[in-house]
Regions:
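M16/insulysin-pitrilysin zinc metalloprotease superfamily fold
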Residues: 71-75, 107-140
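Peptidyl-prolyl cis-trans isomerase
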Residues: 34-36
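M16/MPP (pitrilysin/insulinase) zinc-metallopeptidase core fold and M16-derived inactive scaffolds
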Residues: 42-107, 150-152
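Solvent-exposed, polar/charged alpha-helical surfaces in well-ordered, non-transmembrane soluble domains
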Residues: 59, 80-84, 114, 118, ...
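Proteolytic maturation boundary segments
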Residues: 1-32
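Short, conserved secondary-structure transition motifs
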Residues: 142-148
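Scaffold signal of the M16-like zinc-metallopeptidase fold and its non-catalytic homologs
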Residues: 2, 72-73, 116, 123-124, ...
Length: 170
């Protein structure tokens, strides 16, 4: 595999961490950060797809898929495997869907990073999308939506969207 180093990363003189940005053969851009003062390791993946990409007949699809990716893979079919592995090794995980991005992330005790990355990457390369969890996750996404629908920032953005042309993506 060929790795292409990207340009250097600007940082504060007080920042003792080491940074390396690379592009893999598959065009995945990766930023590596080394901090020897911590006992944790972490990873994140940002996908350039969010709620603005939802088809009109399937609003909430990006958020729904965010939920479904956590629920088992071909290699790790148990829907609780990823969460259990991360929490059993002192870590946490989460994800969020925004207008143009969906971001998945975790942290874990550094000695378990490689195994965690294997589980993490399987969610994107071989998810199960088990039909047994569809209704539950549709309800979870809907519940999150109804809990946030009255948020002033969201209401403001919704009002702005109403003034835009119907052909505008936002």
């Amino acid at each position: 595999q060929t790795i292409k180093k990207l340009s250097s990363i600007p940082k504060s003189p007080n920042d003792q961490r080491q940074y390396l940005a690379i592009t893999l053969d598959n065009q995945l851009e990766v930023m590596l950060i080394s901090d020897p003062t911590t006992d944790k390791a972490s990873a994140a993946l940002d996908v350039y797809v969010g709620s603005s990409n939802d088809p009109k007949e399937f609003l909430g699809l990006a958020h729904f898929l965010e939920h479904m990716l956590f629920l088992g893979t071909e290699k790790y079919p148990n829907p609780d495997e990823y969460q259990k592995f991360i929490s059993d090794h002192g870590g946490s995980h989460n994800a969020f869907t925004s207008l143009n991005h969906t971001n998945y992330f975790f942290d874990i005790q550094s000695g378990f990073l490689e195994s965690a990355l294997d589980r993490f990457s399987q969610q994107f390369t071989a998810p199960l999308f088990n039909a047994d969890y569809v209704e539950r996750e549709v309800n979870a996404v809907h519940s999150e939506y109804t809990a946030k629908v009255k948020d002033d920032g969201r209401r403001f953005f919704s009002a702005i969207k109403k003034t835009l042309s119907n052909s505008h993506p936002y």
